[in-house]
Amino acid sequence: MSIFPIILALLLIGLDEGEALDGYPLSKNNYCKIYCPDEKVCKWSCKHRAGATNGKGDCINKGCYCYDVAPGTEMYPGRLPCNPY
């Protein structure tokens, strides 16, 4: 039995992972991963960040959740986490 199909499958699974245009982590299973300690801003960001909505302002995945980051951490050039502007 060859291990090639197993390795190929693992590589293809890895290709599903990536980053949204705003620099936040993005995965096929949860388009609403957000680094933010503030729940209100987290929900706002979930609706407004690139790749997180269905075009109507609704999250593709309702299981939106937040991660804390160190103060001042830049997730994308010129943008701080939890900055809605």
UniProtKB/Swiss-Prot annotation:
Top-level taxonomic group: Eukaryota
Expression by tissue: Expressed by the venom gland.
Alphabetical keyword list: Disulfide bond, Ion channel impairing toxin, Neurotoxin, Secreted, Signal, Toxin, Voltage-gated sodium channel impairing toxin
Gene Ontology molecular function: ion channel inhibitor activity; sodium channel regulator activity; toxin activity
Principal subcellular localization: secreted
Biological role: Beta toxins bind voltage-independently at site-4 of sodium channels (Nav) and shift the voltage of activation toward more negative potentials thereby affecting sodium channel activation and promoting spontaneous and repetitive firing.
Subcellular location(s) per record: Secreted
Gene Ontology, cellular component aspect: extracellular region
Similarity comment text for this entry: Belongs to the long (4 C-C) scorpion toxin superfamily. Sodium channel inhibitor family. Beta subfamily.
Signal peptide (from-to): 1-20
Disulfide bonds: C32-C82, C36-C59, C42-C64, C46-C66
Gene3D superfamilies hit by this protein: Knottin, scorpion toxin-like (3.30.30.10)
Coiled-coil region list: none
Domain remark in the UniProt entry: Has the structural arrangement of an alpha-helix connected to antiparallel beta-sheets by disulfide bonds (CS-alpha/beta).
Protein name (Swiss-Prot/TrEMBL): Toxin To6
The organism of origin for this protein: Tityus obscurus
UniProt domain LCN-type CS-alpha/beta: residue ranges: 21-83
